[in-house]
Curated annotation (Swiss-Prot):
Domains: entry comment: Consists of 3 domains; the N-terminus binds the ribosome, the middle domain has PPIase activity, while the C-terminus has intrinsic chaperone activity on its own.
A single GO cellular-component term on record: cytoplasm
Annotated protein name in UniProt: Trigger factor
This protein's encoding gene: tig
Pfam families the record matches: FKBP_C, Trigger_C, Trigger_N
Gene3D superfamilies: 3.10.50.40, Trigger factor ribosome-binding domain, Trigger factor, C-terminal domain
UniProt superkingdom: Bacteria
SUPFAM superfamilies per record: FKBP-like (SSF54534), Triger factor/SurA peptide-binding domain-like (SSF109998), Trigger factor ribosome-binding domain (SSF102735)
Signal sequence bounds: none
One BP term from GO: chaperone-mediated protein folding
Length: 452
């Protein structure tokens, strides 16, 4: 067998491989000899079928199967001998001429093919002990706990009927029945009976709640609204609609006394226990936000310390995934590049940079995990599946069965677990210092991004 490297351009490699007909024939004979003791043919005793007869009956299929395995094994040998880690699947170009193919299958001609690959570059890892990371820490203040409990109280507020003839005000709960039309035609999902609406809660289409102000029980109004451009239903998105709406009940919010009795309505023993639960929940939220900031800093350090040319095909794949998502979002919201103060070309350039960073960081994290034998256990994946199932009450078995029968979805759960374990490994080595910050400072970056 002869192997000739024909392309060595950056991370791209191409080889021309020649496999002698004699080698192919020998492999085919080995396969036929193995079949000899397994096949059953009329007129022959088990194990006594002549090889020549087997070749006539199974020759072409055995030859095709043998060549396929021979090519795969040969390629694996080429890559392992040179220490290549493949970025993508090899691109194999086999002979196309029909006569040449026939000659190869019949053992009359050598097999010559080409295999093109893109390799992962060698990565020299940084000294993680030189990394410095600042961990923001927020103490849960009593005022934070009080605010959290007030939000809970507001969400569980009681309502009482307003006096006969009273008009609806912001904050009131109005029970309505409505029939919606677009251009005079009813549409799916446009009808509702006895639906409670809290005016000012922003839980309905923009403009709907505002037009309920001043309505009385028994009164019917035509409410005119326009569905948002990013509305979930594409058939309704951006369209004007009218709802013939009748108020059937009107209630005013009642003051909620935050005491032991209120805590008991939530299943807790006392107000002190409610405060403890609220404080623990806030602490977990702050810890999660702090973790995200630490991780972002660490990824920035990894990015700065590992500059290399990533495989172009992986960058292109990552870019295509992001770009499809961007286009889908723009179509659903109706936004344009001009709305974002940019152009399509400028946006593409920016997202290609992001794709490059993501690919490089992915390769670096993979290298760290591999060199330090970091693995994700089956128990860790199972816990992730259970957590996902808990998020969908009543559909737990459906979620469990989905992941059991869908390896790709399971891999998507495994990936972030692996990444977090690698991050934890680096943090054990890095110099991490804590810094006391306020709640506002902790969430500042996220608020700025939302505003942008």
């Amino acid at each position: 067998m002869q192997v000739k490297e024909t392309v060595a351009d950056g991370l791209k490699r191409e080889f021309q491989v020649n496999v002698p007909a004699a080698d192919i024939d020998a492999k085919i004979d080995e396969k036929l000899a193995d079949l000899k003791d397994k096949v059953r043919l009329n007129g022959f005793r088990p194990g006594k079928v002549p090889t020549a007869h087997l070749k006539r009956v199974y020759g072409r299929s055995v030859a095709a199967e043998t060549i396929d395995k021979l090519v795969r094994d040969t390629n694996d040998g080429i890559f392992s001998e040179r220490g290549f880690r493949l970025a993508t699947e090899p691109k194999i170009t086999m002979p196309q001429d029909q006569k040449e193919i026939e000659d190869i299958l019949e053992g009359k001609s050598d097999l010559t093919y080409t295999v093109a690959i893109e390799v992962v570059p060698a990565i020299e890892l940084a000294d993680f002990k030189s990394f410095s990371v600042e961990k923001p820490v927020v103490d849960v203040a009593d005022s934070d706990v009080d605010e959290a409990i007030k939000r809970i109280a507001d969400a569980n507020r009681a309502y009482a009927d307003k006096a006969e003839g009273a008009k609806a005000e912001t904050g009131d709960r109005v029970t309505v029945s409505f029939k919606g039309t677009i251009d005079g035609v009813a549409f799916d999902g446009g009808t509702g009976e006895d639906i409670p609406v809290v005016i000012g809660s922003a839980s309905f289409i923009p403009g709907f709640e505002d037009q309920l102000v001043g309505i009385a029980v028994g009164e019917t109004r035509t409410i005119k609204v326009t569905f948002p451009a990013n509305y979930a239903s594409e058939t309704l998105a951006g369209k004007p609609a009218e709802f013939e709406t009748t108020a059937t009940k009107l209630e005013a919010p009642q003051e909620t006394t935050i005491d032991d009795e209120f805590a008991k309505t939530l299943g807790l023993e006392s107000l002190d226990k409610l405060k403890e639960a609220a404080k623990a929940r806030l602490g977990a939220e702050y810890a999660g936000a702090s973790r995200l900031k630490v991780k972002r800093q660490l990824l920035d350090r990894l990015d700065e310390a590992h500059k290399f040319d990533a495989p172009p095909s992986l960058i292109e794949q990552e870019f295509e995934v992001m770009w499809r998502s961007i286009n889908a979002e723009m179509q659903s919201t109706g936004k344009t590049f001009a709305d974002e103060n940019t152009t399509e070309d400028a946006a593409k350039e920016e997202y290609r940079k992001i794709a490059d960073r993501r690919v490089r960081l992915g390769l670096v994290l993979s290298e760290i995990g591999e060199k330090n034998k970091i693995q994700v256990t089956d128990d860790e994946v199972s816990r992730a599946v259970i957590e996902r199932a808990r998020q969908m009450p009543g559909r737990e078995k459906e979620v469990w069965d989905f992941y059991r029968s869908n390896p790709e979805a399971l891999a998507q759960l495994r990936a972030p677990i692996y990444e977090d374990k690698v991050v934890d490994f680096i943090l054990e080595l890095a110099n991490v210092t804590e810094k006391k910050v306020t709640r506002e400072e902790l969430y500042k970056d996220e608020d700025d991004k939302t505003a942008a």
